[in-house]
Amino acid sequence: MSAKYPIISITGSSGAGTTTVKDTFEKIFKRENISASFIEGDAFHRYDRETMRSKIAEEKARGVDFTHFSAEANELEILESVFAEYGRRGVGRTRHYVHDDAEAVKFGSDPGTFTDWEEFRDSDLLFYEGLHGCAVTDTINLAQHCDLKIGVVPVINLEWIQKIHRDKATRGYSTEAVTDTILRRMPDYVHYICPQFSLTDINFQRVPIVDTSNPFIARWIPTPAESILVIRFAKPQSIDFPYLLSMLHNSYMSRANSIVVPGDKLDLAMQLIFTPLIHKLLERKHRMS
């Protein structure tokens, strides 16, 4: 953690909806005139697409499911060094993983490859979005570097529905191919993804109120209006719950550290919660400058 150069980390699995949270933060940054450096977890994958396919096949022959959820498939040591360097001096480096043809045009690299590393500096804060923002293993501890840690954790069936629909629509995969990926990733999901949500400051969990019992045949993703949002705070004593309840219609507290909000109030809830927290980080930063 660094008072002078704060780091915000958004952690969530593939299909969890972390991009939605990133979009809300971008709105806040623009409205509040805050400059942020952005890094994506995909940029720290260890292998490009073709090499990853070869690695998966190689490990499968040994009876091992090798996935992007694992620490071994990612350059987490490099990511930690970026967090540490930004926390010390406000500088760092990142790159982009090119997912599809549209990004290939944008970045000038082939799909499934990485762009060159680029340095960033002169920002108010660093914003990370990806799979491992709070990862802790025997060799790395990313959580210790982050000043605000947020988990995005839909209930598992909803997460799978979102992933299946996204991968089919944007990446051309079949339901069977996405299902195979989900199955291969399950051990790493349990060992590497889930433990991070015990280290976050705030978790957002979308819960559908329609039947999602078989996510592999779901024709539609439940809409925000067909969901509720459970928001858990690690330090509830610092949260103004009466204010949130008054501003978020039909919300209520389910536990002393949790509030339940209608699903279509996600954007408003995040803005009400995050804006004062960001201001606190920047006030602390300015006192240190």
UniProtKB/Swiss-Prot annotation:
SUPFAM superfamilies: P-loop containing nucleoside triphosphate hydrolases (SSF52540). InterPro entries: P-loop_NTPase, PRK, PRK/URK. PROSITE patterns: PHOSPHORIBULOKINASE. Pathway: Carbohydrate biosynthesis; Calvin cycle. ATP binds at G12, S13, S14, G15, A16, G17, T18, T19, T20. The keyword Nucleotide-binding applies. Its EC number is 2.7.1.19. It catalyses: D-ribulose 5-phosphate + ATP = D-ribulose 1,5-bisphosphate + ADP + H(+). GO terms for biological process: reductive pentose-phosphate cycle. Keywords: ATP-binding, Calvin cycle, Kinase, Nucleotide-binding, Plasmid, Transferase. GO terms for molecular function: ATP binding; phosphoribulokinase activity. Belongs to the phosphoribulokinase family. This is Phosphoribulokinase. The gene is cbbP.
